[in-house]
Curated annotation (Swiss-Prot):
Disulfide bonds listed in the record: 29-58, 34-54, 39-52, 44-55
Keyword Plastid: no
Name of the protein in question: Paralithocin 2
Lineage: Eukaryota, Metazoa, Ecdysozoa, Arthropoda, Crustacea
UniProt function note: Has antibacterial activity, mainly against marine Gram-positive bacteria like C.maltaromaticum (MIC=50 uM), C.mobile (MIC=50 uM), C.divergens (MIC=50 uM) and C.funditum (MIC=25 uM) but also against C.glutamicum (MIC=12.5 uM). Has very little or no activity against Gram-negative bacteria.
Similarity comment: Belongs to the paralithocin family.
Signal sequence annotation: 1-23
Length: 71
């Protein structure tokens, strides 16, 4: 019975670790002061940009973008 219990714990950790890693992703965002025309569209399409949208990578003083965490 001891070996089965250890196996269950190992499986639980294997399942939990990826979920914890996902929890460290950038915060969900809502758009604030975002005009898409002010941000070059290519920035929004690049895979390395944050998932929240164009505002994430446009400095407010330069492009009129900006974002804040939800909640």
């Amino acid at each position: 019975m001891g070996a089965a219990k250890v196996l269950l714990v190992v499986l639980a950790v294997m399942v939990a670790v990826p979920n914890l890693a996902e929890g460290r992703s950038p915060p969900q965002c809502q758009y604030t002061n975002c005009a898409a025309v002010l941000c070059p569209a290519v920035y929004c399409a690049n895979a390395y940009t944050p998932p929240c949208g164009c505002c994430d990578i446009c400095p407010p003083q330069k492009y009129g973008g900006g974002y804040r965490p939800r909640g």
